[in-house]
Regions:
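Thiol-based oxidoreductase modules, predominantly thioredoxin-like and allied folds used
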Residues: 5, 24, 36-43, 47-62
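A short beta-strand-turn-helix
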Residues: 3-19
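The canonical Cys-X-X-Cys-His
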Residues: 29-32, 75
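Non-catalytic, surface beta->alpha helical segment in thiol-disulfide oxidoreductase systems
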Residues: 77-107
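Structural micro-motif
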Residues: 61, 67-76
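CheY-like receiver
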Residues: 12-13, 63-66, 100
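Structural cue for short, hydrophobic secondary-structure segments
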Residues: 23-25, 77
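Short pre-active-site segment immediately N-terminal to redox-active cysteine/selenocysteine motifs
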Residues: 17-18, 25-28, 71
Length: 107
């Protein structure tokens, strides 16, 4: 299961030393809801190696504004406390998402 990320805990999670992926989503977003099971499945598969978390843009807002999230779902990838060039937007296949996780781990 993916971790819940909020404005209050985001900086600490990003700075944790582990690679981090943040899923910016909302309950009314069909593609976001379709990605939910994939995100949760990959969070379990990569547990201990990558932190995968969900950030609800309707309940929070500062982190989304800081990273200029204009559409959802958007997935940002962080390593060593810094945002990487890896980014996914829109609905993605499990295989595509997993390939990006492997790319993050290889950085």
């Amino acid at each position: 299961m993916a971790l819940t990320i909020t404005d209050a805990n985001a900086k600490e999670i990003i700075a944790s030393g582990k690679p981090v992926i943040i899923d910016f989503w909302a309950t009314w977003c069909g593609p976001c809801m379709a990605m939910g099971p994939i995100v949760d499945d990959l969070a379990a598969e990569y547990e201990g190696r990558v932190v995968i978390g969900k950030y609800n843009v309707d309940e929070e807002g500062d982190l989304a504004a800081e990273h200029r999230i204009m559409s959802i779902p958007t997935f940002l990838f962080f390593k060593n406390g810094e945002k990487t060039a890896i980014r996914l937007a829109g609905s993605q296949s499990r295989e595509t998402f997993k390939a990006k996780i492997e790319e993050l781990l290889a950085l």
